[in-house]
């Protein structure tokens, strides 16, 4: 009797969840104009193309003779005028005024800019010492850190599915660490490999903290969600991160060293310039696409696209840069997908229960 009553309950719960997803998808499609979905499509495409391209270009910089972590960190935020150029028409044509600055808002931008500069520097160490496919898999742990810091700082719900995703993604990172012997480049020492591993995880943790603090900034200080406000935040944070990274470039004399580095770069000065310019463009387009997806859709949608770009980067790195792809790394990739799926399921379940409670009240 117990078994016969249990199975239909589980089946019903799963099918009910699927039907709710279909219903909410249909309602969302009918509620928005066609232009909304076109913009969302191009924003998602920007994430899925620009972020993997940026990762591969960063790795190409180091594999072809680039040495400076500061240069690749500086390039990551040097494309901030691109977002500024997209923001300006909203002021001109929509007659929208810029958000007034106050002391708390300026301090928030400075703190987030400093953290972003530090985050980019940590990831630069990862790109210097790790294959692009490995650094991409490790960077996916930022989702677990985002969930954890979101719970601690923004008080976002942390249900069993989200906790499961944190545990699974952590296990995937441990598997990569165990496979260091087959994953490490011959010219990279053990200490350099584990330094890249460490800074990739630290960068992912800091990225999760930045995400939570950015969400808190929207909730506490900006007080409203609109696209131009999201663009303003991105411009100001990128600008302050650019300022901090420029100071680092000046102190380390890397501006003077760029000409010498370009001459010794494998492929010549032209390729060196192209790698740096396109790194700046692709990274900023990826960030802009992610900002648009967060505004047009949801955090869950951004998480889905973030999950999809991990295998895209890994497969592209194996094909284009001949990264090693062992059985351990494939297992880690599968576990990462599992963790992402669990997170997405937990987030959608929380959103559904929140909407149900608000509608009933």
Swiss-Prot record:
Coiled coil: none annotated. Pfam families: PUNUT. Keywords: Membrane, Transmembrane, Transmembrane helix, Transport. GO terms for molecular function: purine nucleobase transmembrane transporter activity; purine nucleoside transmembrane transporter activity. GO terms for biological process: purine nucleobase transport. The chain crosses the membrane at residues 37-57, 70-90, 105-125, 134-154, 158-178, 193-213, 235-255, 285-305, 315-335. It is found in: Membrane. Residues 75-178 form the EamA domain. The keyword Membrane applies. It is a multi-pass membrane protein. InterPro entries: PUP_plant. The keyword Hydrolase does not apply. GO terms for cellular component: membrane. Belongs to the purine permeases (TC 2.A.7.14) family. This is Probable purine permease 5. It comes from Arabidopsis thaliana (Mouse-ear cress).
